[in-house]
Amino acid sequence: MSQSTSVLRRNGFTFKQFFVAHDRCAMKVGTDGILLGAWAPVAGVKRCLDIGAGSGLLALMLAQRTSDSVIIDAVELESEAAAQAQENINQSPWAERINVHTADIQQWLTQQTVRFDLIISNPPYYQQGVECATPQREQARYTTTLDHPSLLTCAAECITEEGFFCVVLPEQVGNGFTELALSMGWHLRLRTDVAENEARLPHRVLLAFSPQAGECFSDRLVIRGPDQNYSEAYTALTQAFYLFM
C-alpha cells in the first residue's frame, strides 16, 4: 500500500504500508509505540518477539523494516486485542511472517526452544491505583499482570547472546527499570531520551538492553522544532511510516 493509494479509515491508524485497527484494544496506537517500532535496532535479526502485542503495531513495524526471511512472534494475553492484531496482520503485506499467539508470555515461553535476536515491548508501567474503566485497560496500563522483574526474566530466558531487548517507558520509570535490569545482569547498550521540544525535559526514554556487555550509546530526540513542526530527527526516524510525512 503506497502513500498515494492509502485511504484514511476510521477506528484505527493508517500508515504508509499498513492499517492498524485498534477499537477493540485497550491501548490505542500512539507516539510511544511508533517511536519504539521505528527505533529498535533490526540489523542482522532473524527472529523477533513482541511481548504484549496489543493491536499488532510493533510486529507490523518490525515486519516493514526487516527482510522477508525474518519471522516475528507476537504474544498477547487479552483475547480481543489478539484477535484484532491477527486481523490487522492478515490485511498487511506480511501475514506469512507474523505469528500471533493468544497466551500468557510466561506460560508460552515454557513451550518454546527458539531464541530471539530482538525482543520488543511497550510494557505497562503504572502501579495499581485509580480503577480503570475496563479490566482490559487495567491489564494494559498496570504492572499487575506482568511486572517489570518478570518481564526482564522472560526476555532473558529467550534472547540470543548478542540480541537486544527494547522498551519505551516514561523517563523516571525508565531510570528505575534500568537499575533493575542492571541488577539482573543485563547491559544497557542504547538509550534515547525523548522530549517534546528543546525547551522541555525528556518525558520518554527508549532503552535497548543486551546480555552481552559493550559500550552504551546515548542520545536525545526532540519531536518538534521551534515552528512546532516535526523535527528533522523525528522525521528521519518515522517518515517510512507516517502517511503524510
UniProtKB/Swiss-Prot annotation:
- Function according to Swiss-Prot or TrEMBL: Specifically methylates the adenine in position 37 of tRNA(1)(Val) (anticodon cmo5UAC).
Does the entry feature the keyword Manganese, yes or no?
Answer: no
Give the chief site where it resides.
cytoplasm
Identify the InterPro entries for this entry.
Answer: DNA_methylase_N6_adenine_CS, SAM-dependent_MTases_sf, Small_mtfrase_dom, tRNA_Adenine-N(6)_MTase, tRNA_adenine-N6_MeTrfase
Subcellular localization is given as: Cytoplasm
The record's annotation in Pfam families points to: MTS (PF05175)
Q: What is its EC number?
A: 2.1.1.223
Q: Which NCBIfam families match?
A: tRm6a37MtseTrmN
Name of the molecule in the record: tRNA1(Val) (adenine(37)-N6)-methyltransferase
Q: Its family?
A: Belongs to the methyltransferase superfamily. tRNA (adenine-N(6)-)-methyltransferase family.
Q: Name one GO cellular component term.
A: cytoplasm
Stored PANTHER family: TRNA1(VAL) (ADENINE(37)-N6)-METHYLTRANSFERASE
Q: A Gene Ontology biological process annotation?
A: tRNA processing
Q: Which residues form the signal peptide?
A: none
**Enzyme class per UniProt:** transferase
- Reactions that this protein is recorded to catalyse: adenosine(37) in tRNA1(Val) + S-adenosyl-L-methionine = N(6)-methyladenosine(37) in tRNA1(Val) + S-adenosyl-L-homocysteine + H(+)
UniProt KW keywords: Cytoplasm, Methyltransferase, S-adenosyl-L-methionine, Transferase, tRNA processing
MF terms per GO, please?
nucleic acid binding; tRNA (adenine-N6)-methyltransferase activity
